[in-house]
Every structure is written in structure tokens, then in C-alpha cells.
Swiss-Prot record:
Disulfide bonds: none annotated. GO terms for cellular component: cytoplasm. InterPro entries: GMPPB_C (IPR056729), GMPPB_N (IPR045233), Hexapep_transf_CS (IPR018357), Mannose-1P_guanyltransferase (IPR050486), NTP_transferase_dom (IPR005835), Nucleotide-diphossugar_trans (IPR029044). Keywords: Cell cycle, Cytoplasm, GTP-binding, Nucleotide-binding, Nucleotidyltransferase, Transferase. This is Mannose-1-phosphate guanyltransferase. Its EC number is 2.7.7.13. It comes from the Eukaryota. It comes from Kluyveromyces lactis (strain ATCC 8585 / CBS 2359 / DSM 70799 / NBRC 1267 / NRRL Y-1140 / WM37). Belongs to the transferase hexapeptide repeat family. Pathway: Nucleotide-sugar biosynthesis; GDP-alpha-D-mannose biosynthesis; GDP-alpha-D-mannose from alpha-D-mannose 1-phosphate (GTP route): step 1/1.
Amino acid sequence: MKGLILVGGYGTRLRPLTLTVPKPLVEFGNRPMILHQIEALAAAGVTDIVLAVNYRPEVMVETLKKYEDEFGVSITFSVETEPLGTAGPLKLAESVLKKDNSPFFVLNSDVICDYPFKELADFHQAHGGKGTIVATKVDEPSKYGVIVHDIATPNLIDRFVEKPVEFVGNRINAGLYILNPEVIDLIDLKPTSIEKETFPILVEQKSLYSFDLEGYWMDVGQPKDFLSGTVLYLNSLSKRDPAKLAKGENIVGNVLVDPTAKISPTAKVGPDVVIGPNVVIGDGVRITRSVALSNSHIKDHALVKSTIIGWNSTVGKWARLEGVTVLGDDVEVKDEIYINGGKVLPHKSISVNVPKEAIIM
């Protein structure tokens, strides 16, 4: 089987982290975001994976080619000279995706969930249609494009309603699909949208179905959702592989800690925290609902809440960070500084308080 991951472009919503590395290589749960997807595809029997990229492909190649042997897959890069939307990349990768008659998976690189690829493939084969969309239930469907089903046929999609005013359903497109190769014949090699241009054709042909996703789902393409997704991911990990989570008197709730990190016994870590490689956490530190990326240092008695601390960054003594603050690479926050919702670009030194949301350039 085959899979295509829509990697896309600049990752502007996740800046300042994506000023240093492409978004799929930002560590989520202490490994590059895209690796969660590659591993799940490989586990479902996928042997050929195409990454559709249009930004810094050389960095992606250098980082990801080494995982081919580990997961037993072939990883190829389909490089767009201009952004091709969500359907164009399928046409560009036609030679790989149509190399045999088996269906192929398509997924957005921002999506984190317990990927149900094996079950999805079985469901797709059973209904005999040309495409299947993974659907997830949401509390506020009015923000999304909602899937409406055919009354007579279970799971057959009748139409999509964009941001409905009245309740028509609560299932939305989760950004994961399985499609038959002939779907590529419906796509032109130009910037096109699979959601707006390709799927409506399949709906008209009564050949597009939806598969309900069980468990958590999150598009982690921006900082607040990255942190919310981390909470959901750690909760899922606590159920399916609890041995991976940290234990100890100073650990509260679900916490993932790289073995090379050094945490003071008087620090209190958690709940919902990820600590990366070579991170140092000083005496009396309190950190909750946050991510500390590799080689960062949180000094004594700092308070860190709802924050992403970038690689090689330092948080000073008695500093306080909260409100979805994001530090880019190699940022220094001086002692006793308060930052509330600041987005700090790489290589900055912060010596004055940032009391409300701001971009520090």
C-alpha cells in the first residue's frame, strides 16, 4: 500500500518554531511530528510513502531518509515548484500512487490522533466506493465544514455543509483519507482543493463514504492547539503505553521525559508536560501544560504554564511564563521576567515584562 502526506509550506501558524525547522520536524511528544504518521502508516502495511513538500525539502530529506530502514518503507519527496493546494500534490505524485491498483492513504501533516489506518483500509474495501474520509465528532460544528450522510445508505456522504447555522450534524473531515487510484484522474496538475473540487464529484457519483474516528483528534498546526494536542496525546499514551510516562514524587499526572533530561527533585512537573533531550530543570521550578524542547534550561523557581520553550532557550530564575507563550530557538528570558502570551523570535534576549499577547522581534 501507499500513503501521501501533505506537508505543504511555511508553517506560519506555528512560528516562531518554524523559523528554525519545517513544521513536520518540530518535535511533538519528543519526536518529529511527521514521524508519528510515518510509523502508523508502516504499521498498517504501507511500503511507499510520498511527502508532498514545497518548503525546505533538503532539510526534510536529510532528516527523514534515515528512517526508511527503521520502518521498512520507501520515502520519496514530491517537490512542488508552486503550492498545489490539497489535490494537486496527488496528481504530481501520480507515478507512485498509481504504480499498482491498491488504494492509497492521504493525510494532512498537522493531524495527531490514534491513526486507524488498518481499520480504515478494511472499511474502505468493504463498502466498494472510490473514497473514504475519516470523520471526527466536534462540539461546535458551526466552525467547520460538516458531513451530512445519505438517509438510506449508512456512511455514504450526501453533501458537505460549510459552517452551518442550523444543526445538520457534528461530524467533520479529520484530514485523513483513503482513495482508489482512479480518483487521481479527476484532478488537474494545478493548485486545486480536494475538499472543494474533488470530493463533490465523488459525492455526486455516490462513491464517497465516511469512517468514524474513535478517540482523540487534533490539528496541531498552531501553538494553542499544539498544547491541547499534547494533553490529548499524553492521555492516550497513559492508556495504551503507560510505561513510557514518567513516575516520581515530583511528577504530577501525565508527563513524558527524555532520559537525558535533568530535573531537580524539588521541581514539580506536570500535569501534561513534555520534557525533551538534555533539558535542565532547576530547584523549585513549577511547570504545567507545557513543552520544553531539547537543550532548554528552566532555572530555579521559575513558573511555566501553557508554554512552548524552544530549543536551546533559557528561562531565568523566578521568571513566569504563561498564556500560550512560545519561545523560539536560543531565546534568553532574564531573571524575574513575566511573559503572558508572547511569541519570541529566535536568538532574542528578553529583559522587560511582556504582560499581554505580543510578537517579540
